[in-house]
């Protein structure tokens, strides 16, 4: 996926989060995403950073939806997205280490 496509996906997920904000308390689930301080408008950030933000945000959204009463979201979806966020974080850390070594 190209960086501009990732930024568009990131923006879409932010819209989904804003929609969910009206009906749910989202603060706890989104704490990690908010602490990243990476928004879709930060086009200077790397593709890997946006990818990480997308996975963290997707994981938070899935946790919010899983918590909803009567929701049939399987737990493996939430777990899978959390695992993808964890792997993506490792990529960002490696990239930052390479940049610092230069």
UniProtKB/Swiss-Prot annotation:
- Using the chain's own numbering, where are the disulfide bonds? none
Output the Gene3D superfamilies linked to this UniProt entry: Uncharacterised protein family UPF0058
Matching Pfam families, A to Z? UPF0058
Q: Which family does it belong to?
A: Belongs to the UPF0058 family.
- Identification of the protein by name: UPF0058 protein MTH_224
Native source organism of the sequence: Methanothermobacter thermautotrophicus (strain ATCC 29096 / DSM 1053 / JCM 10044 / NBRC 100330 / Delta H) (Methanobacterium thermoautotrophicum)
Q: What is the lineage of its organism?
A: Archaea, Methanobacteriati, Methanobacteriota, Methanomada group, Methanobacteria
């Amino acid at each position: 996926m190209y960086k501009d496509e990732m930024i568009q996906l990131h923006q879409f997920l932010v819209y989904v989060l804003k929609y969910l904000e009206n009906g749910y308390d989202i603060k706890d689930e989104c704490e990690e995403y908010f602490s990243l301080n990476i928004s879709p408008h930060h086009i200077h950030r790397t593709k890997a950073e946006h990818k990480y933000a997308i996975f963290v945000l997707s994981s938070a959204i899935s946790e919010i939806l899983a918590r909803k009463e009567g929701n049939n979201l399987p737990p493996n979806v939430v777990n899978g997205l959390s695992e993808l966020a964890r792997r993506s974080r490792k990529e960002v850390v490696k990239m930052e280490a390479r940049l610092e070594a230069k």
